Amino acid sequence: MNQYVVVDLEMCKVPYSNRKKEFHGANETIQIGAVLLNEKYEVVDEFNTYVRPEFGSLDWFITNLTGITSKDLKSAPTMREAMKAFIAWIPEDAFVVSWSDNDLKQIQKEAEAKLI
């Protein structure tokens, strides 16, 4: 049976002045959303978590675009904690896809930079 996890990230900008040697990324994940689809492409489960940024911060544009507020992120898990929960949620036999390669590249870059 084929299952698909479709992932979508929301990100905030990391100001150039906040980019440190250990984190060079221009963006930082603030939300991981995903749906699990069965072989008929029907939604059978959902995953959603906010992610507390370590280097970036919300600006009015991202809040207006996503509806995510600083209050949502204040007690959110770190990227390490969020990724651990996300990976545990993904079935072993599922194919993971995203709307574009940007989200998968973001996960890779951020995981590498944060030693996840």
Residue locations for each model-derived region?
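Conserved non-catalytic scaffold segment of RNase H-like nuclease domains
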Residues: 2-108
